């Protein structure tokens, strides 16, 4: 299935049905009076987050959505039926923005629903206008028009851990080694053109979602290369795994480039817990491994792990470390949401 993470759509709720002008006509009843029913309410347009989706591709082929019009009222005080609602189903993690890209709602939980456009009310039938002066009103209200708006849908995948690095740093190979995902893998930059998700199963109770995004290059925050469009997919992650290609000459420069792009993008990406790893060590001898590990650790001011996505060397250990950080972050978030505990006093 093709990946699409941003699309503009147009929604319109249904118009309300018109009220009816009708009079009671029955045998032996000379002056039956008005009995026009009200029009039905126009249909609403809703958006709902559902599990099992990870792309907005369905909205590439249809961008206009209109709810049903309310049915007009009828005689004998029969009200019209309401128009049919439209429910737009989107992946969990989809943001809804107005035409100016201001956030309307974040569909961050499965089952969450939000009203995008409310249907117009139905018009009153002539029964409502009967009075002591006018006992046979010959007019009714038309239904109110529905609402119309243009909105943007922007998907930010929900993953626990994000993989970052320059193009060809071996992120897709690492994802394939860590999970059952089957991303496209080739020995050239920008092989990955869309985010990939994989579920990492370390053991019972040790499971998390790993996201691989297209590689960053210098100036990505200004739109260079693929730009930072896909960085939004790691905004929700708890931990970053930063892979540096150990076979290249300037490993420190590679690390600095990615760090700069994370800081320039904002959204606190640069402040997330980060595991720095030198990848492709299967192509290095022991002496070169140690030399490059020390060089990168000194520049970054943090420990550097040695891994090989190709052979799987040290991959499990790195994933367990990432899971421990994810668990710690989730525990801290839960405690913060619960608020300070009040001590019991007699």
Swiss-Prot record:
Key words of the record: Cytoplasm, GTP-binding, Hydrolase, Magnesium, Metal-binding, Nucleotide-binding
Ligand binding (Mg(2+)): 172, 192
Entries under Pfam families matching the protein: GTP1_OBG, MMR_HSR1
Residues making up the signal peptide according to the UniProt record: none
Record-stated family: Belongs to the TRAFAC class OBG-HflX-like GTPase superfamily. OBG GTPase family.
Quaternary assembly: Monomer.
Record's function text: An essential GTPase which binds GTP, GDP and possibly (p)ppGpp with moderate affinity, with high nucleotide exchange rates and a fairly low GTP hydrolysis rate. Plays a role in control of the cell cycle, stress response, ribosome biogenesis and in those bacteria that undergo differentiation, in morphogenesis control.
UniProt protein name: GTPase Obg
Organism of this sequence: Phenylobacterium zucineum (strain HLK1)
Organism taxonomic ancestry: Bacteria, Pseudomonadati, Pseudomonadota, Alphaproteobacteria, Caulobacterales
């Amino acid at each position: 299935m093709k990946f699409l993470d941003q699309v503009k759509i147009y929604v319109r709720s249904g118009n309300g049905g018109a009220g009816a002008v009708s009079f009671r006509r029955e045998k032996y009843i000379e002056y039956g009076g008005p009995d026009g029913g009200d029009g039905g309410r126009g249909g609403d347009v809703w958006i709902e987050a559902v599990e099992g989706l990870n792309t907005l591709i369905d909205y590439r082929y249809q961008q206009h959505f209109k709810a049903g019009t309310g049915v007009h009222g009828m005689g004998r005080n029969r009200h019209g039926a309401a128009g049919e609602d439209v429910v737009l189903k989107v992946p969990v993690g989809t943001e809804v923005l107005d035409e100016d890209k201001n956030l309307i709602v974040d569909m961050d939980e499965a089952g969450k629903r939000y009203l995008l456009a409310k249907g117009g009310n139905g018009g009153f039938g002539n029964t409502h206008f009967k009075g002591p002066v006018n006992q046979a009103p010959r007019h009714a209200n038309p239904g109110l028009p529905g609402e119309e708006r243009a909105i943007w849908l922007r998907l930010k995948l929900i993953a626990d851990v994000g993989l970052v690095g320059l193009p060809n740093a071996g992120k897709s190979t690492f994802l394939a080694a860590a999970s059952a995902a089957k991303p496209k893998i080739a020995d050239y930059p920008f092989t990955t053109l869309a985010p990939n998700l994989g579920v990492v199963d370390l053991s019972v109770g040790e499971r998390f979602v790993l996201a691989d995004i297209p590689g960053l290059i210098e100036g990505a925050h200004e739109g260079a290369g693929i730009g930072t469009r896909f960085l939004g997919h790691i905004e929700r992650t708890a931990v970053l795994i930063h892979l540096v290609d150990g076979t290249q000459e300037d490993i420190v420069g590679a690390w600095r480039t990615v760090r700069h792009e994370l800081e320039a993008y904002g959204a606190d990406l640069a402040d997330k817990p980060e595991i720095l790893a030198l990848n492709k060590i299967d192509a290095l001898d022991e002496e070169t491994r140690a030399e490059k590990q020390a060089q990168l650790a000194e520049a970054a001011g943090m420990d550097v792990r040695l891994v090989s996505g190709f052979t799987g060397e040290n991959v499990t250990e790195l994933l367990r470390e990432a899971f421990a950080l994810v668990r710690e972050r989730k525990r801290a978030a839960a405690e913060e949401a619960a608020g300070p505990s009040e001590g019991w006093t007699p």
